[in-house]
UniProtKB/Swiss-Prot annotation:
Gene: AHL29
S-S bonds: none
Protein name: AT-hook motif nuclear-localized protein 29
Gene3D superfamilies: Hypothetical protein, similar to alpha- acetolactate decarboxylase, domain 2
Organism: Arabidopsis thaliana (Mouse-ear cress)
DNA-binding region: 72-84
InterPro entries: AHL15-29, PPC_dom
Start-end of Pro residues biased regions: 32-44
Biased composition (Gly residues): 237-251
Taxonomic lineage: Eukaryota, Viridiplantae, Streptophyta, Embryophyta, Tracheophyta
Chain intervals for the UniProt region annotation (Required for the binding to non-AHL interactors): 164-169
Miscellaneous comment: Overexpression of AHL29 results in altered cell expansion dynamics and delayed senescence.
Entry remark concerning the domains of this protein: The PPC domain mediates interactions between AHL proteins.
Amino acid sequence: MDGGYDQSGGASRYFHNLFRPELHHQLQPQPQLHPLPQPQPQPQPQQQNSDDESDSNKDPGSDPVTSGSTGKRPRGRPPGSKNKPKPPVIVTRDSPNVLRSHVLEVSSGADIVESVTTYARRRGRGVSILSGNGTVANVSLRQPATTAAHGANGGTGGVVALHGRFEILSLTGTVLPPPAPPGSGGLSIFLSGVQGQVIGGNVVAPLVASGPVILMAASFSNATFERLPLEDEGGEGGEGGEVGEGGGGEGGPPPATSSSPPSGAGQGQLRGNMSGYDQFAGDPHLLGWGAAAAAAPPRPAF
C-alpha cells in the first residue's frame, strides 16, 4: 500500500491478527471459562486498632449488648447503687420497764378478781386496772361502817354484801404476781343501783360478772416498793426495795429529791387504790349506807 506504513515484517503480522474476527472470538471466552480468583481485602492493622480504641471509649453501661459480647468488665460503681433505702431498725427485745396496754374481756358468770389474778400470775406481770364497764351481781364490799342500810345485809368486820344486779361506774386497782407483800394489791369499785344510788368500796372476792365486762388495763414487769415520806438528804438513808422484798432494808443511798414530803398518790396506786373511797365516807347519800354510816368513826390509815 502507498499509505505510509509497511505491511511487511512484524507490523504486518500484528495488523493482520487485529483484523481477523475468528481469532478474536476464540480468545474472548477464555477469561469467562477460567476466571481468576480475586484476592479478599485484608483488614489493615491500623484500622483495627482504631476500632478497638473507639469501642473502649464507649460507656459500658450504655450498650449492654456490646459489653456482654466483648466480655469486658465494666468499671466504676454500677448505676443505681447509691442512695439505696436502708432497712428499718427493729428492736425485738422489750425493755423491762415498758408498759403494755390490754383490753381484757371477762365472760359472764366468771369471777373478775380471780380472772385478773390468774392472768397476772401466768404472765408474770403486774396488772393495773384503769377502768371497767359492765354489770355485776351479788357484790361484797369492805366499808368503814359495820352496819348496812337500804336493803343490804350487813356483816361483821366491815364487809357488806349487796344482792342484786349493779352497773359498774368505775373499777380501778392493781394486781401483783407472787411474790408480793400482803396488802399491796386490790380493786376498788363504784356501782350504780337500780334506784340510782351510788355504792363504792374495796372489792371482796368473789366479784361475779352478770354480763360481759370490759377492762382497760396496763401491765408492767417490775415495781419498786418505797415507804413515804422520804427522809431528808442529811438524815438517815431512805427505805426502799423491790416489791418481792417486802419494803427493803435501811441504809440505802438517799434519793435526790426535795425535802418536802411527796403526796400519797404513789402509795394509793401501789396498794390498788384501796383508800380511794375514803373521801366519800362523810356523804351517806353517795355511799348509800344511811346516817349510821356517816356517824361511824373514820377508817384508820394503812
